[in-house]
């Protein structure tokens, strides 16, 4: 593996364990790869325990348990118990589907610290349509059970063109449920969301109206419910510091053991991300070519190389650059300084046109195989 000067590198602090790609829902904005149904076997319980131990020894302290739907793993409580023994702060990121009071109590006993529940819409018909599964009533029960079992209620609603008109109702639903935290996560366009972008990207006017409603409501519930509004990249003129900088803070392990600097990095060609089945976490973090590829600033092209903002945003998202320009070393096209910024503007302009002539692809194994066969 390619080497790096260890003394100059930070250690991973946040480990995202994508335990499985299995999921009973079929959300068309899912960030999982399009070809997920063709990927290899999931890591075993013992393999996950080894990964958690190695990452913790290296410095990781926050553990996200996601998927797919992590509740489909019957060994979830065992993994949580091991994480707790290692000293992680554990966060279950779930649709809530498959969670009941018995399982919540089991996870609580195992030492789980935090549960984040996603809801697609405050209205049953749209929620179940977007999820591809009748799940709305159960999600509401789960949200209440979570709080009854002593957890803070953390709701996440992914925002897009299909539900952005419901912003006021989303906020009222969260308030009525007694949510302690509400994350309004505007869709980021990777994986299935990019495939369905023409159906999902709101217009500029829709976004501005929804943001104003959210900001106003934030003042109304100040001290009672914290609202986090994640602005979509496409409506910024400067990119975010993706993952706080490539290979500096975040480490994702996919269900088949592939180690990723960010959860979408699997889409980058020629990156050759290593597997935890072949290398230790220490080797992957310090030695792998994939994790060293976009560290520091030497890889940058203009306009990033001479930009005074490069130490703030690190050139933006490598995956977004590749998906929109074909070159993962290009400046993130979200940036107004990028020579490819017009591609973001074109995507926004396309929201004014009807997307009815294009199918909406739901995230399921049949579509995964058909699209990548």
Curated annotation (Swiss-Prot):
**Co-factor: note:** Binds 1 [4Fe-4S] cluster. The cluster is coordinated with 3 cysteines and an exchangeable S-adenosyl-L-methionine.
Which reaction(s) does the protein catalyse, per the Swiss-Prot or TrEMBL entry?
[PQQ precursor protein] + S-adenosyl-L-methionine = E-Y cross-linked-[PQQ precursor protein] + 5'-deoxyadenosine + L-methionine + H(+)
Q: Which residues form a coiled coil?
A: none
Q: Which PROSITE patterns match?
A: MOAA_NIFB_PQQE (PS01305), RADICAL_SAM (PS51918)
Q: What does the UniProt keyword field contain?
A: 4Fe-4S, Iron, Iron-sulfur, Metal-binding, Oxidoreductase, PQQ biosynthesis, S-adenosyl-L-methionine
What Gene Ontology molecular function terms does this protein carry?
A: 4 iron, 4 sulfur cluster binding; cyclase activity; iron ion binding; oxidoreductase activity; S-adenosyl-L-methionine binding
All residue ranges annotated as the Radical SAM core domain in the record:
9-224
- Give the matching Pfam families: Fer4_12, Radical_SAM, SPASM
Cofactor dependence is on: [4Fe-4S] cluster
Q: What is its EC number?
A: 1.21.98.4
Q: Which SUPFAM superfamilies match?
A: Radical SAM enzymes
Please give the biological process terms from Gene Ontology that the record holds: pyrroloquinoline quinone biosynthetic process
Look up the record and name the pathway of this protein. Answer: Cofactor biosynthesis; pyrroloquinoline quinone biosynthesis
- Enzyme class, top EC level, equals oxidoreductase
CDD domains per UniProt: Radical_SAM (cd01335), SPASM_PqqE (cd21119)
Where along the chain is [4Fe-4S] cluster bound?
A: 23, 27, 30
Q: Which InterPro entries match?
A: 4Fe4S-binding_SPASM_dom, Aldolase_TIM, Elp3/MiaA/NifB-like_rSAM, MoaA_NifB_PqqE_Fe-S-bd_CS, PQQ_synth_PqqE_bac, PqqE-like, Radical_SAM_PqqE_MftC-like, rSAM
Q: Give a short account of what the protein does.
A: Catalyzes the cross-linking of a glutamate residue and a tyrosine residue in the PqqA protein as part of the biosynthesis of pyrroloquinoline quinone (PQQ).
Provide the assembly information: Interacts with PqqD. The interaction is necessary for activity of PqqE.
Q: Which family does it belong to?
A: Belongs to the radical SAM superfamily. PqqE family.
Q: What protein name does the entry list?
A: PqqA peptide cyclase
């Amino acid at each position: 593996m390619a080497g790096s000067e260890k003394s100059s590198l930070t250690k991973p602090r946040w480990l995202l364990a994508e335990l499985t790609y299995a999921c009973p829902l079929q959300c068309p904005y899912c960030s999982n790869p399009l070809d997920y149904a063709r990927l290899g076997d999931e890591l075993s319980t013992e393999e996950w325990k080894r990964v958690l131990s190695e990452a913790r020894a290296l410095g990781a302290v926050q553990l996200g348990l996601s998927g797919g739907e992590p509740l489909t793993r019957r060994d979830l409580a065992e993994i949580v118990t091991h994480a707790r023994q290692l000293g992680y702060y554990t966060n279950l990121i779930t649709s809530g589907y498959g969670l009941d009071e018995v399982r919540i109590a089991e996870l609580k006993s195992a030492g789980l610290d935090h549960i984040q529940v996603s809801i697609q819409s405050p209205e049953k018909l749209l929620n179940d349509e977007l999820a591809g599964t009748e799940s709305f009533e159960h999600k509401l029960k789960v949200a209440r059970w979570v709080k009854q079992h002593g957890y803070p209620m953390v709701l996440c609603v992914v925002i897009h063109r299909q539900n952005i008109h419901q912003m006021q109702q989303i906020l009222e639903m969260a308030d009525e449920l007694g949510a302690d935290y509400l994350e309004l996560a505007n869709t980021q366009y990777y994986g299935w969301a990019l495939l369905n972008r023409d159906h999902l990207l709101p217009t500029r006017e829709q976004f501005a109206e929804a943001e104003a409603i959210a900001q106003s409501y934030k003042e109304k519930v100040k001290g009672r419910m914290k609202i986090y509004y994640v602005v979509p990249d496409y409506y910024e003129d400067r990119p975010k510091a993706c993952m706080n900088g490539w290979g500096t803070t975040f480490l994702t392990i996919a269900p088949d053991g592939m180690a990723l600097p960010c959860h979408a990095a699997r889409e980058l060609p020629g990156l050759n991300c290593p597997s935890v089945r072949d290398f230790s976490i220490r080797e992957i973090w310090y030695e792998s070519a994939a994790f060293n590829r976009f560290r520091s600033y030497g890889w940058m092209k203009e306009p990033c190389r001479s930009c005074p903002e490069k130490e703030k945003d690190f050139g933006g998202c490598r995956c977004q650059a590749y998906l929109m320009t074909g070159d993962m070393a290009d400046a993130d096209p979200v940036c107004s300084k990028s020579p490819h910024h017009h591609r973001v503007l074109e995507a926004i302009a396309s929201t004014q046109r009807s997307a009815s002539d294009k199918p909406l692809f739901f995230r399921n194994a049949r579509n995964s195989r058909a699209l990548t066969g």
